[in-house]
UniProtKB/Swiss-Prot annotation:
Native source species: Psychrobacter arcticus (strain DSM 17307 / VKM B-2377 / 273-4)
GO molecular function annotations of the record: rRNA binding; structural constituent of ribosome
Gene that encodes the chain: rplW
Pfam families in the record: Ribosomal_L23 (PF00276)
HAMAP family: Ribosomal_uL23_B
InterPro entries (UniProt xref): Nucleotide-bd_a/b_plait_sf, Ribosomal_uL23-like, Ribosomal_uL23/eL15/eS24_sf
Superkingdom of origin: Bacteria
NCBIfam families registered for this protein in UniProt: PRK05738.1-3, PRK05738.2-4
Alphabetic keyword roster: Ribonucleoprotein, Ribosomal protein, RNA-binding, rRNA-binding
Coiled-coil zones: none
Protein's recorded name: Large ribosomal subunit protein uL23
Length: 116
C-alpha cells in the first residue's frame, strides 16, 4: 500500500451533533472515507496524516444516499462510506473548524483596519 493511496482514503471529517458528542465523551472521530477503503487502510491513513495519534479501533458503515425531489423531478444523493475511528485515551485529532477560521480572519482584518 503506497502513500498516495493513503492520502486518498480520508475524504473529510463529519461535523454533526452525534460526531461531536462521540468525540467529546469517547474520543471517537468520524470521517467520510473512500467507498473501497478497508479498516486497516483507514487506520494507517489516520496514523499517517495525524502524527502522534494511535488508533485503537475502526468501525465502518455504508450510508445510502437520500432520495430528494427537485420540483417535479426526483434526484438521489450519492452513497458514501463513513468511519468511526476510536483513538487512544487522551489523544485528539486537531482539525480546524470552518467557523473558527472565519472568525479569526475577520478579527485579524478588523484589527489591521483599525491600526491603519
Amino acid at each position: 500500500m503506497n502513500n498516495a493511496r493513503l492520502y486518498q482514503i480520508l475524504r473529510g471529517p463529519v461535523f454533526s451533533e452525534k460526531s461531536q458528542m462521540l468525540g467529546d465523551s469517547l474520543g471517537v472521530q468520524v470521517f467520510k472515507i473512500d467507498s473501497k477503503a478497508t479498516k486497516l487502510e483507514v487506520k494507517k491513513a489516520v496514523e499517517m496524516m495525524f502524527e502522534g495519534v494511535e488508533v485503537l479501533k475502526v468501525n465502518t458503515l455504508n450510508v445510502k444516499g437520500k432520495t430528494k425531489r427537485f420540483g417535479k423531478s426526483i434526484g438521489r444523493r450519492n452513497d458514501y462510506k463513513k468511519a468511526y475511528v476510536t483513538l487512544k485515551a487522551g489523544q485528539d485529532v486537531q482539525m480546524a473548524d470552518a467557523g473558527e477560521e472565519v472568525a479569526n480572519t475577520t478579527a485579524s482584518t478588523s484589527e489591521t483596519a483599525n491600526n491603519e
